Amino acid sequence: MKKNKFVLTLLLSVMLSLQAIILPTAFADDEIKNEPADNVVGFEPQAKSVILLEPNSGNVIYEKNADEQFAPASVTKIMTMLLAMEAIDDGRITLQDKIVCSEKVKSMGGSSMILDTGEVRTVEEILKGIAIASGNDAAVAMAEFLEGSEEAFAVKMNERAKELGMTNTHFENSTGLSASGHLSTARDISIMSRELLKHPTILNYSSIYMETISEGRKTPIELVNHNKLVRFYKGCDGLKTGFTQEAMYCISSTATRDNVRMLAVIMGAPSFKQRNADASKLMDFGFSKYQSKTIVTKDCDVQQIPLNKKGDSFFIAKAKDDLKVTIEKGGEEELTKKVNINPELKKINAGDVVGYCEVYNGDELLGKVELYSDREVKQSQFFKNIKDILSNIFDHSI
């Protein structure tokens, strides 16, 4: 395989008036690429609609009827979990907050964690009930806890779907139980699945195959994961299955191997075995096409930053964390590494964040990492001659 070439560009974009540097506010990995996918996967998925993608970049590897609307069944609960995880990570609720179950919670049919009226469970336990057992009662309990009623929660679900660009989705409830107009698409499900993956704590629950909750109960709650791939498919750690007579067998499945993550959404499979087979084969295909590459490692020297024209005064910009990207195997991609230093800093201490390093494939941003200074730079030293700094643009292979 031809060795990948990396182009290092040091960009110091400074207006002569020393106005603030303009940093990008939207990144390519926040949108799913809608380019035609390579559809040669070696088999024909039997589900009505599928999509396979690399979730970090959003690159679609394979799709079939990905924009056709179908009932999503309990895959709906991905949005329920997403809103819960956003509330947790925003600090509005905690995993140990108490949820008191209502009469409506007890009355929910279908998949259940057998919650009783007045029963008190933690947010974490309810999340487990949703992620593992696909509990309709757990989903309603979470909805009522967050918004006061399931109806109000459904409004929030639709608002979030709109924000995410899920243009072919409408939610009527938090559970996915059949309801008129409750529809989504494989592509939209992949969008909310990618968003949920930004809250990796959820994988601590969706990856569990069996769990027992016994505290405060005479009869323990036995949870068994409806997603059998977490037990039988190497690297699978989520996300959510679904089934109703209307929807048939659905899943949003994800797995990691060798630091590469795949996401496959299946809608309308004729059986749970076929659903799992389609998801497994698609992810196998994805893993055969993509690889993970480490660009920089934590605390490594990324770039020497000159402070004068001679270059005898400088500091070293070092990586705050590892920077790994997922790229297609066997391609001729030219990865561009760009180092951006904030020119407005007048004084820095050792360890201060001074900018960031980005990696691109063409115009597509694959990843970024913050950079910090290895030493103190006094105000009198920092960017002493702006014109000299502007002339320091590096372009070479490494």
Q: What are the functions of these language-model segments?
A:
Residues 3-4, 72, 123, 379-382, ...:
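Structural motif marking the loop-to-transmembrane transition
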Residues 166-167, 178-183, 187-398:
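Domain-terminus/edge residues, biased toward the C-terminal soluble/receptor-binding domains
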